[in-house]
Amino acid sequence: MSALRNIKFNEEEDGELPCLVTGEENNLQEILENVSYDGGNIVSDAKVERVNKQVENTSAGATDVHEKKRIPVSIITGYLGSGKSTLLEKIALKGADKKIAVILNEFGDSSEIEKAMTIKNGSNSYQEWLDLGNGCLCCSLKNIGVKAIEDMVERSPGKIDYILLETSGIADPAPIAKMFWQDEGLNSSVYIDGIITVLDCEHILKCLDDISIDAHWHGDKVGLEGNLTIAHFQLAMADRIIMNKYDTIEHSPEMVKQLKERVREINSIAPMFFTKYSDTPIQNLLDIHAYDSVRISDILDSGSGNGTIHDDRMGTIMLTFRPLKNEEEYNNKFIKQFLQPLLWKNFGAMTVLGGRRRDDGRDWEVQRTKGLILIEGENPIARVIQGVRDTYDVFPGKYDGSNKECKIVLIGKYLEKESIEELLRKTLE
């Protein structure tokens, strides 16, 4: 239709421009009696040829429908040996009804997939797609960049419905998530759908509890921050948690209970799936839209864990508070005096402490933010807040009357619920 919109009248091809008949003319019968038809085409052959040519040229010059379609990206993270590559195989190589592209950013001896699919391309920072022959594509990236992935998508029009990005086992997924999480105005051809964290049920507690490098079973050089390991950050950023190798602990109900409690202390909002060989229905993992909307149930049913095990290094807290009175209170108080200081450079902690830093040096850092904010007024509205570390965005929400309180869930390190609640209380006084 966009091509036809630009078709113009040509008197030589189309003949005399006809008069418009509305049916309300006083001499309508006289007009109809003078209507003649020569038996030819209503639209001239020249006109048909010109329209067809213009449509062809427009189609050739315009961006392809497949290129315009935004492609979702799921980031798969977890330590080497946790089952990431097995999960990729389950999703991409065994019966998925999507045309999936797999991007590998980890080179490990245990991954036969990587050995089979990695191809070289000179000194380029990214490598070409490899067609696997079953509707899926694969490539390996050493220097991940959104532009590199967008270029690959553009060179494969119509071949990609979904992208799976496997990170290095020792990678913090937050910077990668922020890289993909772009403003709609940037018109990127890809967007982040969610982060899937794969855990090894048998070893994850050891990874979380023992921060010595020698204690880590996977053999990687573990990135440490204070007394936090990358496993803490991978869990905190997860939108879906795959508890893999469940068969190694299912014989011990106590171990299963302890594992659930520990994971929930760190991240209480991501759905958790216990698996063997990373086998779980695809609909549990793909097209979850974790970064562009929040299901109300995710917020209402989430909060800090209530188990007997507490990990004060990384955890989840939930704040509930009254609806905001108006847009002014939302913008000038909640956003500028609470949310932004909370997320930016630990100003929140310093504000609560009268402008000084904590004596123990353990200033909090929010890893993930999800919130539902209700704003009263003549026409009540709701806002959904999504955040990754110091970056956040706001989306329209639904104010259906069933929700009576604002709720915000924070996942991060060294979070002090009492201090953050105090900051919020002072802000909204």
Curated annotation (Swiss-Prot):
Disruption phenotype: Impaired response to zinc deficiency. It holds the Pfam family CobW_C. It comes from the Eukaryota. It comes from Saccharomyces cerevisiae (strain ATCC 204508 / S288c). It catalyses: GTP + H2O = GDP + phosphate + H(+). Its EC number is 3.6.5.-. Disulfide bonds: none annotated. One of its GO terms (molecular function) is enzyme activator activity. SUPFAM superfamilies: Hypothetical protein YjiA, C-terminal domain, P-loop containing nucleoside triphosphate hydrolases. A motif (psi-PxLVp motif) lies at residues 15-22. A motif (CXCC motif) lies at residues 136-139. Residues 362-428 form the CobW C-terminal domain. Belongs to the SIMIBI class G3E GTPase family. ZNG1 subfamily. GO terms for biological process: cellular response to zinc ion starvation; protein maturation. This is Zinc-regulated GTPase metalloprotein activator 1. Zinc chaperone that directly transfers zinc cofactor to target metalloproteins, thereby activating them. Catalyzes zinc insertion into the active site of methionine aminopeptidase MAP1, which function to cleave the initiator methionine from polypeptides during or after protein translation. Mechanistically, the N-terminal psi-PxLVp motif binds to the C6H2-type zinc finger of inactive form of MAP1. GO terms for cellular component: cytoplasm.
